[in-house]
């Protein structure tokens, strides 16, 4: 039977539950435990797919096409596992499923109530993860903060789980904040005491308290929390703010959490193998020269909107021995000030995914600037589309008004257009091209050189595609279609041959990057940018016969 770790949060939101859960997963995996993870989100949306990035941050897409919480990205990166739609459950999904069953008559005329119908549906979703993944331990994060009215059915469900699967198979972890009062230099425990009491009111007694703080906490603070929370002192785990999120597993391991969890769950003492992770953290903290990379978007005020892109850039920088210095550039600011003052000091430009026409001309301009000045460029989803639009305007003429029908339904040159199967769709949620799809690569290209194989699978999230009516025209002018669907109908990757490194992809490679294994496209993009930095200017690099950039780039 699988065992379950339920992680709740108290005092304040955004204290680091997601990173804590991901780190616990890493500690257990390092001990040879088969782990899976699930996030329970109390919001009533069915998924975050239609939510504003300002409300929710990034929408993380799983291999099977689910639009999920950004915490799943942390889980995948830390544990190095591909999760599925089972790993993200929302109140909207739960109520939709229960109402559908009621409409079918599955409840035989019974009155539908939160208990037992809603809670049973939640428990069924939790159990499904263990059943379908074969995990020994399922770690379940409950979104929000204890005391939120939306979270009550989820707390009741996880309370019942201890009775359903046995007390020895369930463990509750509460992540809480210890505020530091600057005027007195004190760390206050009272909010944590109240949070633990609030959790007890719904019938849950925490087995472990993870204490988030900006500074290391003294032993007397741990003793005090252990007394009031009625837990072992070793179950009060200090977690102070660290330089890199990838340090967190090592901080928790040093505090003894890994061994404590395995002993409490009856898994025995297992020696962890964290050598590779320690090496990773050492490389992260080692001094490196900074490499300025521009990230051009319209949500740059909220970095969480592009969190997987940021992490993928950092992974690649770590691999290439540079510290990626991300310059957050608003595409609307480019529209106002032009590219030169904002982009002249960067050595690579990334335009990530997005929707809507706000700031779109700034993104198109950034793609054009990279093309004209020989700056390495990586376009992701929308970033590939704006690169296509920019190139088309260059080929056909600026007055052509080449565009995407997403931004101009009446453009005379729709080089980016609706996918045919999207034309009759009216609902927004869950209706895009979502999840992993195969892409066949063209030998002798940057893309093929990066991957080193003939076909790959990458994750998608889009409605619009490259318009094949313009393919021959643009190819004749120097555009290279280096990746396409196996049937040849969909253009997936474009690049420019006479350029240091200029690649646009219709998918989201950032979702598959790992700290120990950077995504090939990000790796080679940063390599090209680093080479440009070494040479001190932007100039074309030779494309060797096997499709790799010059040997100096690979150095």
UniProtKB/Swiss-Prot annotation:
<feature type="binding site">
    <location>
        <position position="54"/>
    </location>
    <ligand>
        <name>L-glutamine</name>
    </ligand>
</feature>
<feature type="region of interest" description="Amidoligase domain">
    <location>
        <begin position="1"/>
        <end position="267"/>
    </location>
</feature>
<comment type="subunit">
    <text>Homotetramer.</text>
</comment>
<comment type="pathway">
    <text>Pyrimidine metabolism; CTP biosynthesis via de novo pathway; CTP from UDP: step 2/2.</text>
</comment>
<dbReference type="GO" id="GO:0044210">
    <property type="term" value="P:'de novo' CTP biosynthetic process"/>
</dbReference>
<feature type="domain" description="Glutamine amidotransferase type-1">
    <location>
        <begin position="292"/>
        <end position="535"/>
    </location>
</feature>
<dbReference type="Pfam" id="PF00117">
    <property type="entry name" value="GATase"/>
</dbReference>
<comment type="similarity">
    <text>Belongs to the CTP synthase family.</text>
</comment>
<keyword id="KW-0479">Metal-binding</keyword>
<feature type="binding site">
    <location>
        <position position="224"/>
    </location>
    <ligand>
        <name>CTP</name>
    </ligand>
</feature>
<feature type="binding site">
    <location>
        <begin position="382"/>
        <end position="385"/>
    </location>
    <ligand>
        <name>L-glutamine</name>
    </ligand>
</feature>
<dbReference type="InterPro" id="IPR017926">
    <property type="entry name" value="GATASE"/>
</dbReference>
<protein>
    <recommendedName>
        <fullName>CTP synthase</fullName>
        <ecNumber>6.3.4.2</ecNumber>
    </recommendedName>
</protein>
<feature type="binding site">
    <location>
        <begin position="188"/>
        <end position="193"/>
    </location>
    <ligand>
        <name>CTP</name>
    </ligand>
</feature>
<keyword id="KW-0315">Glutamine amidotransferase</keyword>
<feature type="binding site">
    <location>
        <position position="13"/>
    </location>
    <ligand>
        <name>UTP</name>
    </ligand>
</feature>
<keyword id="KW-0067">ATP-binding</keyword>
<feature type="binding site">
    <location>
        <position position="71"/>
    </location>
    <ligand>
        <name>ATP</name>
    </ligand>
</feature>
<feature type="binding site">
    <location>
        <position position="224"/>
    </location>
    <ligand>
        <name>UTP</name>
    </ligand>
</feature>
<dbReference type="GO" id="GO:0042802">
    <property type="term" value="F:identical protein binding"/>
</dbReference>
<keyword id="KW-0665">Pyrimidine biosynthesis</keyword>
<feature type="binding site">
    <location>
        <begin position="148"/>
        <end position="150"/>
    </location>
    <ligand>
        <name>CTP</name>
    </ligand>
</feature>
<dbReference type="GO" id="GO:0046872">
    <property type="term" value="F:metal ion binding"/>
</dbReference>
<feature type="active site" description="Nucleophile; for glutamine hydrolysis">
    <location>
        <position position="381"/>
    </location>
</feature>
<dbReference type="GO" id="GO:0004359">
    <property type="term" value="F:glutaminase activity"/>
</dbReference>
<keyword id="KW-0436">Ligase</keyword>
<feature type="binding site">
    <location>
        <position position="71"/>
    </location>
    <ligand>
        <name>Mg(2+)</name>
    </ligand>
</feature>
<feature type="binding site">
    <location>
        <position position="13"/>
    </location>
    <ligand>
        <name>CTP</name>
    </ligand>
</feature>
<dbReference type="InterPro" id="IPR033828">
    <property type="entry name" value="GATase1_CTP_Synthase"/>
</dbReference>
<feature type="binding site">
    <location>
        <begin position="14"/>
        <end position="19"/>
    </location>
    <ligand>
        <name>ATP</name>
    </ligand>
</feature>
<feature type="binding site">
    <location>
        <position position="463"/>
    </location>
    <ligand>
        <name>L-glutamine</name>
    </ligand>
</feature>
<feature type="binding site">
    <location>
        <position position="406"/>
    </location>
    <ligand>
        <name>L-glutamine</name>
    </ligand>
</feature>
<dbReference type="InterPro" id="IPR029062">
    <property type="entry name" value="Class_I_gatase-like"/>
</dbReference>
<dbReference type="GO" id="GO:0003883">
    <property type="term" value="F:CTP synthase activity"/>
</dbReference>
<feature type="binding site">
    <location>
        <position position="141"/>
    </location>
    <ligand>
        <name>Mg(2+)</name>
    </ligand>
</feature>
<feature type="active site">
    <location>
        <position position="508"/>
    </location>
</feature>
<feature type="binding site">
    <location>
        <begin position="188"/>
        <end position="193"/>
    </location>
    <ligand>
        <name>UTP</name>
    </ligand>
</feature>
<dbReference type="GO" id="GO:0019856">
    <property type="term" value="P:pyrimidine nucleobase biosynthetic process"/>
</dbReference>
<feature type="binding site">
    <location>
        <position position="354"/>
    </location>
    <ligand>
        <name>L-glutamine</name>
    </ligand>
</feature>
<keyword id="KW-0547">Nucleotide-binding</keyword>
<dbReference type="GO" id="GO:0005524">
    <property type="term" value="F:ATP binding"/>
</dbReference>
<dbReference type="Pfam" id="PF06418">
    <property type="entry name" value="CTP_synth_N"/>
</dbReference>
